Amino acid sequence: MLSKNLLHRRIRQFALETPDWATAIRYHSKPDEKHDLTLIARRVYGLPNEWPIIMASAGLQSVDEPLNEQLLVLPTLSQLQTLKRELGVI
């Protein structure tokens, strides 16, 4: 569980600190995704189970918290897998 909490913090840090010119996925959330983060995870990564990454990037603290339409800065799938390996999540 500690690794997942650290992953959440690292993803949020990535979202806040990644410069515009750096490699990342920039995704504008849509109205239909407000209460279903799996939609974004499926659209971005093709993997609905990556919804916690979306939650962390958006700065949400609870799955019950609605996602306002915004620009999300997300790691690429390769960056995400590397980060998960470094933290021992996979």
Model-derived regions, located:
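Cell-surface/extracellular proteins and modules involved
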Residues: 1-90
